[in-house]
Amino acid sequence: IPLRLVGSEMCIRDSPIIFPLSNPTSKSECTFEEALTHTDGRCVFAAGSPFPDVTFQGRTRVADQGNNFYIFPALGLAGALVQAKHINDNVITEAAIALADSLNKEESDADRLYPRLERVREISNYIAFRCIKILIRDGLCRDNGLTASMNDDELYKWIAARMWLPDYSH
């Protein structure tokens, strides 16, 4: 990692933003451990490749993987379910906000940027729900008012029932 870049970031903010996005892991601009070491553990880190957890200053830190698998499936699901005319900037912004809002207390306390991967279906359902609410508000649905007639609980369950579940047991 170029120390001059980290130094510049540390002059601007208390928690430098370090997003080494190159793939594969062997080509990454820096490792999670290097980022923590060069920022005294204060960095905001997400990588394009997976990195192992690091114990730094007696605390186990989790390297988040910045990837589109949290947002794009939910955007596609929302658009398909309501037969959206198009996906506007409001919907994309709402997807990003919904992802940020989906962190639970444990994840927030661990300074995670993204929810745990094990929760991806739950998160996708939540993001799709929030996106559909914006699609309804902005008049972009072509579902003959079906989703607009549902209350929030009905809509949330309706989305969940239509999510694809990979089942290769037969």
Task: Write out the residue ranges for each language-model feature.
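Adenosine-phosphate binding glycine-rich loop
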Residues: P16, P20-D152, W158
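Active-site loops and adjacent core secondary-structure elements that bind or stabilize anionic groups
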Residues: M10-C11, K157-H170
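Single conserved hydrophobic/aromatic residue that forms the stacking wall/gate
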Residues: I1-G7, I12
